[in-house]
Amino acid sequence: MAQAQYAGTGRRKNAVARVRLVPGTGKITVNKKDLEEYIPHADLRLVINQPFAVTSTEGSYDVHVNVVGGGYAGQSGAIRHGIARALLQVDPDFRDSLKRAGLLTRDARMVERKKPGLKKARKASQFSKR
């Protein structure tokens, strides 16, 4: 019999992560690299493991992720969102705890666009009264 696989798609800023959960030992692979190798920041690795901590399933699933777009922070948020959605397929009873932790909600914050006449989105050149 084929091993059960659970899939989820996560998004954050410009990053899109396609996540597959397979029952296993807790190994996380991102774009065919180990998690520690792909994401060097420890705090972002904690962000990725949040859904497992909330549902008490640490070390129960191997995670295979394909992620494109964005930087480290956006990709970590997208992976977290994807893992949370995949865990929902594992057990629908996780919905309440994941929702309460805010892990099922797509973070809608995006980069503010640059306005004409300004140097950046809000930064203006120095004002001189005289």
UniProtKB/Swiss-Prot annotation:
Q: Name one GO biological process term.
A: translation
- The organism's superkingdom is given as Bacteria
Gene Ontology cellular component terms for the protein in this record? cytosolic small ribosomal subunit
UniProt keywords, alphabetically: Ribonucleoprotein, Ribosomal protein
One Pfam annotation reads: Ribosomal_S9
Which GO terms of the molecular function aspect are on file?
RNA binding; structural constituent of ribosome
Q: InterPro entries, per this entry?
A: Ribosomal_Su5_D2-typ_SF, Ribosomal_uS9, Ribosomal_uS9_bac/plastid, Ribosomal_uS9_CS, Ribsml_uS5_D2-typ_fold_subgr
Gene3D superfamilies assigned to the protein according to its UniProt record, in alphabetical order: 3.30.230.10
Where are the membrane-spanning stretches? none
Entry similarity comment? Belongs to the universal ribosomal protein uS9 family.
Q: What is this protein called?
A: Small ribosomal subunit protein uS9
What species is this protein from? Streptococcus thermophilus (strain ATCC BAA-250 / LMG 18311)
